[in-house]
């Protein structure tokens, strides 16, 4: 399945960001499959881009934590 990356993102950025999202979920003892993790990660990356952020570890971690809190995960 072909995915659409957010602007200026690379496949490497996606993988790096997925690790961050997975670590956050693991710390909450939440298990999801790779497809779900990728969907959440792409959403977080899109939010980061829309807010003027980049795909650095610190920025993605902050947006991911906020996103997961808002959606109730």
Spans of model-derived segments:
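Short, charged early-sequence alpha-helical segments and their helix-coil boundaries
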Residues: 39-73
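Hydrophobic membrane-targeting and insertion signals
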Residues: 1-2, 72
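N-terminal acidic leader/helix
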Residues: 2-34
């Amino acid at each position: 399945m072909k995915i659409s990356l957010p602007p200026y993102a690379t496949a490497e950025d996606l993988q790096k960001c997925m690790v961050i999202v997975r670590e956050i979920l693991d710390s909450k003892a939440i298990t999801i499959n790779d497809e779900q993790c990728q969907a959440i990660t792409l959403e977080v990356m899109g939010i980061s881009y829309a807010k003027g952020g980049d795909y650095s570890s610190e920025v993605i971690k902050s947006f991911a934590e906020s996103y997961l809190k808002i959606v109730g995960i």
